């Protein structure tokens, strides 16, 4: 029988909250030697993901030309409100200010093939695994899938 996401995921992963200090989240990433964290609300429901890509905002010097390239994306300054939001994200000091909102997630009953296809399609390296109430119960990474394939 084919393995499911629940068979391979890391259960009870480290998580952070939107109000967690960014410095604290970075320390947690380093201690756990991981590249991303699910962000949950007080009820444990998934509200975002913090990744190394999100943290790259912190390393960017912001000099507002008519447009600028930020994390390989061209951001045009035709809309000053959007620029202000992007600048604020770049300089944010809490997880909530830097995280990727509207995260892509998966439930444990999906197949590994479905998880791999979703990661590839959405260009993500990890998927928070949620239950029917959208509470984080695990995390699955590309590495988890590759290691499972190698052991079969």
Feature roles, as predicted:
Residues 122-126, 141-152:
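Gly/Ser-rich helix-loop-strand patches that form or flank binding pockets
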Residues 48-51, 56, 138-145:
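Short hydrophobic beta-strand motif reused across regulatory alpha/beta modules
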Residues 56-71, 145-152:
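A short, polar/charged loop-to-alpha-helix boundary motif
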Residues 131-132, 148:
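A periodicity- and composition-biased signal for non-globular, repetitive helical segments
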Residues 1-28, 34, 39-42, 46-47, ...:
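Bateman/CBS regulatory modules and CBS-like beta-alpha motifs in cytosolic regions of diverse proteins
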């Amino acid at each position: 029988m084919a393995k499911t996401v629940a068979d391979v995921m890391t259960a009870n992963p480290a998580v952070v909250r939107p109000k967690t200090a960014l410095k604290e989240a970075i320390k947690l990433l380093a201690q756990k030697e991981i590249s991303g964290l699910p962000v949950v609300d007080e009820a444990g429901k998934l509200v975002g993901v913090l990744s190394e890509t999100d943290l790259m905002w912190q390393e960017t010097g912001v000099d507002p030309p008519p447009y600028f390239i930020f994390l390989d994306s061209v951001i045009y300054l035709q809309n000053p409100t959007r620029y202000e939001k992007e600048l604020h994200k770049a300089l944010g000091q809490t997880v909530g200010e830097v995280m990727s909102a509207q995260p892509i997630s998966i439930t444990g009953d999906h197949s590994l093939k479905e998880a791999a296809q979703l990661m590839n399609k959405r260009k993500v390296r990890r998927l928070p695994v949620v239950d029917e109430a959208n509470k984080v119960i695990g995390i699955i990474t590309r590495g988890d899938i590759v290691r499972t394939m190698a052991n079969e």
